[in-house]
Amino acid sequence: MKRTILLTALLLCAAGTRAQDLYNVKEPPTTEILSRPVEAGRIHRTEVVPYDKRHDADARNLAGVEAYMAYTPEPFAASGDAVAVGQVVDIPYVWTDGVVYLHLENVGTAYTLTVNDSKVAEVEDSSTPAEFALTPYIRQGKNAVVLTLRRSAADEINAAPASRKAFENSYLYTQNKRSIRDFEIALVPDSTRRFGVLKLAIVAQNAFNYDEPVTVGYDIYSPQGKLLEFNMQEIVIPGRMTDTVRFTPFIYGTNANKWEPGAKNPPLYKVMLFTRRDGAYREYMPMKIGFGKTELIDGRLTRFDKELKLVKADYNAAADRKTTLADLKSLKAKGNNTICPDYPQPAWFYDLCDELGLYVIDCANINAPEKRDDRRIGGTPSNAPSLADEYLERVKAMYYRSRNHSCVIAFSLGGESGNGYNMYKAYEWLKSVEKSRPVIYADADGEWNSDL
């Protein structure tokens, strides 16, 4: 079976008295409910945790970060094929003055997310990590964050989920109401091919109900540890809105630090994004990027004006980072330079591929090999218009999580799942947001919705 409900059900005996805690969390008076922020429910954006202090961001050290808490739900009820798991989360006062998010990973099945008995979202994708904006649903003090694990309404397109510890790397975190909502970043050659250009777009958000100034900035260090550029900009954003701040500085010396497969230690530039308020830095978001640009030119996949020769290996991340690192090193030693997973991977998988100099063709969790040749309407899930929104949701979830990684050179619509209306719509959406890298679909079978 493509889900882990039975495994979760076995954990019921360990639930203890937590069930009583979950059932006893009452709704607060309406006057206590926080004002609605920029967004609510499921969101799509770059997967990155904000840090309180720069040294913690540099070290990726979450211990002691006040804006972060682990989410480790326990089973407390079962009914038919569904199992309820949850955690009573104690939200401190300082969090209620910000925007609160939940990151879910390794759930292993479809689920319905509720917070304090309010439905937040229903998710059919059993493998792709997901994020949710929770601010309208939470309050100071105890909050019941519950997942109802169930059979997916789109089970026929789910890949078998990875065998990892349930809910590993799931967490809640908060950001200031004036903060970084998302970003796009790339370090690419300039038009003369002599220098590099940092193309950075920071989406800033203001979750207050009125206009507020928001200051965002960045710095970038060379692979050798030299500070190359530092800048910040203030922008006034209307209440409950976002706006984009763009930076495009020249970065010199990049041709000596090209990110390419084959190198023993591919060079990576360190970028730190931050916000500033009243002279103090409020949050830090770290990122490592390689210099170069993957482009589709005249039907050829190129980098540094040379056609790429891809040696592919099908591989999904193992249960842990250490094992995955060993596997990836072994694949590289055998001459492979391109990794092709079956569905979106943990964020650390892309970090490893960045560090090792391995290309990745990222893939949405769409895997429906049965009846893939039946092109009647509804004959295959890929040609069932009722699933169009689900296909788009999965493609968006894949794209926004991994698009900023240097290792990702192309995006695949899914595994062998036939072709049809849903794949056409998915291709059109991806092409509307991705202007450089190709969109690939092996089962396009010569139709227009695949670039290679």
Model-assigned labels for residue ranges:
Residues 1-8, 19-347, 351-355, 409-410, ...:
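Secreted/periplasmic carbohydrate-active enzymes, especially glycoside hydrolases
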